[in-house]
Amino acid sequence: MPFCRNCGNELDEEAQFCPKCGTPVKNQVMEKQVRARQRSMSPWLIAGIVIVAVIVLIGIIFIAFLFGGFLPFGRVGSGNIITREEPINDFSAVEVGSGFNVQVLQASSYRVLITADDNLIDDIQVSKSGNTLQISLRPFVSFTASSLKAVIYMPNVDRIQFSGGTIGSASGFQLSHELRVELSGGSRLDMIGEANKLIASCSGGSRLNFGDFKVNDAEVNLSGGSQGTIRLDGNLNADLSGGSHLNYIGNPTLNVNNSGGSSISKTSN
């Protein structure tokens, strides 16, 4: 039962004016209903805002780690660059993420050199899993480095995987076996040498530059706007999607599946 806000007189539900003092009361009822509606909506509105904010934050964190491993907050490198050698041997595969610049060089022995700011280098994780050398930032670590570089010496290589905007080169390898390459998150690999067969997968705008790396046969999968150049004269099996493009040098037998605006073309030396 409503009451007049002016004199406190009890009112009928349908009353538009207070019979005692004549004060309009219709607006009071409407205001009460509006306030009740606002109170019922407030928890949902607040919850919606919180959910949107969390989604945006997660998106920023994901993109930052995907393209380089750096968040828009975190520590800043001192500018004092040091190089540390990691005591790891007996690996034939390399996995590097978090936006490193990488050189992979053929050599008679193993060496792993990491270069970064002196106040950040301890947050770089270098380990071995099976026959694979793994280099990345430690989990949940973010910083802006003056330099983030890895130089890897190894006698033989059978797999290279770059992610998170890692850019690198490999040279000196004359391989009689197949080489597997996996690039994601805008990574890039330039390679000089040769192998019997190349199996390559590139996604997320990555680039494979193998114009100076000769192979007999190749299986290439490009997606998400990735690009590649390869050199061969044997069989080329290619699956291209999402606006990707593949250049080839030589006269291979082609078996190509294009979709999503992708393309393939022959190029000169």
Language model features with spans:
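Intrinsically disordered, low-complexity peptide-like regions
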Residues: 4-10, 22, 78, 219, ...
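Extended, compositionally simple hydrophobic/Ser/Thr-rich segments
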Residues: 84-87, 91-104, 148-269
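Cys/His-rich metal-coordination motifs, chiefly Zn-binding "fingers/knuckles"
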Residues: 1-33, 41
